[in-house]
Amino acid sequence: IWLLHVYPSPSYHGYDITDYYDVNSDYGSLEDFKNLVDEAHKRDIKVILDMVLNHASSEHPWFVESKEDSNSSYSDYFIWANENDNTYDFNSTPIDGKAWSKFNDRYYYGAFWHGIPDRNASNPKVRNELINVGQYWMDLGVDGFRLDAAKYMYAEGEYNLELNLLEENLDFWNEVITGWKDSKEDLHIVSEVWSSSSSVAPYFSSLDSNFNFDLADSI
């Protein structure tokens, strides 16, 4: 069973997560989730859960605090830059529309939308937090994760212009997945790298499987 993002979220699509340690009340409770996993396992059915790590809701407590206080420890959990910082491209458009949104005299980065700001994947504390999130759901019996937007942990215009984005993405996923598999070797990972097959190929060095969008489009 592949479950889409079941976490609390203020929107219909659920990509803007406000709490990574709970279940959206529209779907039930954590006890309901545990029962689902237990009943699935009794029937030799594995459960794969969507894991949206690249970004969080702009209503997530960490982002709210980082927005209200530039000196907060959570400020470095997201990508913030001063408006006169020329090491960033504030006009970058990795998807559709500008990725940088202005708040007072600062900008924050959200590749998909200003309502889902990107996390700072270069921050070791963020990496540890995300490893802990995965561990939490593994402890509840989850057998694998579908990684959303895997290539956007390091995206166009998000970090210093000199970075090799592919290398940084692979390094990030190697660290996080190793952290997970240290306690569950048979954890299965499938990722969404929405790109051509040639661009997806390098991710097999870090991930168990990837969606083949070229094949899907050709069928």
Description of each model-found segment:
Residues I1-I219:
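Active-site and adjacent substrate-binding regions of carbohydrate-active enzymes
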